[in-house]
């Protein structure tokens, strides 16, 4: 899923309505940012509220094990205000480029990458169609069942068609979506609900 309204996403975590985050580090990161940016808590109150939340909702929580991590997250929260995206807009020419692959699995993967690139341009400040991805999560979001050894082949095929490229410094899992055209006619607008199941929006 893609997050469009990060403050609402963090609030759902705070209210224990969002259980899809499994890692403690991510939970603490969202909580400390929520306490700072949404509830205007001081650093000391931010720490206390985060500890109280973890004690309430995280089984076997031991403050001594997480004290440094929480303190660090409280400091880092200042550098990460929440972002908000109204809708992800897909244009006619973008859809035509995707459809030109004539392969449904590849089309779904590319559609997801396009949406991710548009979201990450706001969430991460990426430019020029840069998108960070995990091949496992990409296939999961696209709802395609592909043997592990064939997953990179799908991406390679899309690259060969000129629709994806690699950044000059490719030391991370990043690609460049080469066909973004925000100036064309908008034919699809994806809201928060749509972005929970992108594969079904294509």
Predicted regions and their residues:
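Modules that initiate DNA replication and primer synthesis
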Residues: 1-106, 114-129, 133-179, 187-189
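Short, amphipathic alpha-helical interaction segments positioned at domain boundaries
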Residues: 178-202
């Amino acid at each position: 899923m893609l997050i469009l309204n990060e403050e609402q996403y963090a609030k759902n975590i705070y209210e224990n309505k969002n259980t899809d985050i499994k890692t403690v580090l991510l939970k603490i990161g969202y909580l400390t940012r929520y306490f700072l940016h949404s509830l205007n808590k001081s650093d000391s109150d931010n720490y206390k509220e985060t500890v109280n939340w973890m004690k309430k909702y995280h089984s076997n929580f031991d403050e001594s094990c997480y004290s440094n991590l929480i303190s660090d997250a409280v400091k880092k929260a200042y550098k990460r205000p929440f972002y908000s995206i109204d809708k992800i807009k897909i244009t006619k020419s973008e859809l035509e480029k995707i459809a030109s692959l004539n392969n449904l699995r590849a089309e779904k993967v590319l559609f997801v990458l396009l949406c991710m690139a548009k979201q990450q341009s706001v969430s991460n400040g990426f430019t020029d169609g840069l998108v960070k991805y995990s091949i496992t999560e990409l296939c999961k979001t696209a709802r395609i069942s592909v043997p592990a050894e064939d997953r990179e082949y799908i991406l390679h095929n899309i690259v060969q068609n000129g629709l994806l490229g690699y950044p000059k410094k490719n030391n991370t899992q990043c690609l460049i979506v080469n066909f973004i055209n925000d100036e064309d006619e908008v034919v699809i607008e994806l809201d928060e609900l749509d972005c929970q199941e992108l594969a079904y929006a294509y």
